[in-house]
Amino acid sequence: MNNSEELRQQLHSINRKSYPAYKALKGVYHFGNYLLSIDHVQGDPFASPSHVSVQISHTDARFPKEYYKNFLSRTTLCDYLTRQFEKQVSHFSFRAKGSGKSGLITVSHCDQEILSRTACEINEKGITVRFFVGFPANGRTINATELEKILFDFLPVCVRKSFFYCSLDAQNLLNYMQLAEDQEFIHHELSCRNLCAFVADGAILPRESGISSHPMKDSIPFNSPESLRISMELPHQGTITGMGIPKGITLIVGGGYHGKSTLLNALELGVYNHIPGDGREYVITDNTAVKLRSEEGRFIKDVDISLFINDLPNKKDTHCFSTLDASGSTSQAAGIVESMEAKSQLFLLDEDTSATNFMVRDAFMQQVIQRDKEPITPFLERARDLYEKAGISTILVAGSSG
């Protein structure tokens, strides 16, 4: 392992050379209270940026041990640290000049969900963060002076402000960790109370726009119907109330623009924990939930869709069905069967994105097309059996089909 001064000398020695000379920098360098590892060097300044990582020992980082004692706490802490690092590097990205991607400093972007990511990991040795740096060049000539700024001026500031407990807002981090524990508690309560989902009173479900996952300003907070309102005593937040959706078959109905799909979309993402301030912090759904839709044109390989589709005109065997170009109904049937194979216990469906002929056949169409002429058994005829025989619940948005 080399020290930081040896890296500085290497930078001076390759300055103004051809860009491939940067590859000599690959290796691990000691920067006092952290290790800098240059893992992959880009081929030229216009290629995907170089891969760099930093390792900080637990002794130096000094986070309380309970913050990384199990998978939930490690995932939550890593998510928090990644967001802090993303915020810090955004102040310095492209401040080092050059051509192409020169000066870029970036890490995997975190959206509103708290997820396990390879960008930041915690093990028994310490914290590892992986990110990208555009090594600077003028044309295809190395500009080591600018890379020196990144590695010796910008990066130490970002690391210090992001990965050392003494540099962070301890109360803010504690609130972040406690929220995750409250969310995990609700996940556990769902099974104990025979529920498949929970939506807290006061939740903000609408999003800012179709391309933004941030909460919509001035939106109406969720208010549970009295018939479904329950209360929970959380470990940290205390008592909260909201709508508990029981296992079984649940219909979400209402007029247009009344939030049916918005509620279903929130339930879809309720399998993940959300960050404070998202509005959906206490929208919690069964971890096995799957959002299903028609996927016309998809590939299907050896799936038994005979539960829904039989006696196709071309004599194709639906017990082991394959196609390169599925129809709307066969694609949705395959999606349901695949979800059953994956042990899903909750299906989420919206009639707007479903194949109508797969979902329902009204009385008029049953008279027009006799049952022996129709290969499709509608989902609504199977929904009760799915719950009673396989324990699979359904939440369905309906606005036009009875």
Question: Which stretches of residues belong to each language-model region?
Answer:
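N-terminal accessory targeting/assembly segments
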Residues: 1-185, 190-194, 205
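Long, charge-dense accessory insertions within large macromolecular proteins
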Residues: 164-220, 291, 297, 316-320, ...
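N-terminal pre-Walker A segment at the start of P-loop NTPase domains
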Residues: 206-241, 284-289, 293, 298-300, ...
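Glycine-rich phosphate-binding P-loop
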Residues: 240-268
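Post-Walker A helix-loop "phosphate-sensing" segment adjacent to the P-loop in P-loop NTPases
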Residues: 269-280
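Flexible beta-alpha connector loops of hexameric P-loop NTPases
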Residues: 298, 308-329, 361-376
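Phosphate-binding/switch loop-helix module in NTP-utilizing enzymes
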Residues: 320-354
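Conserved P-loop NTPase nucleotide-binding/switch module
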Residues: 340-388, 400-401
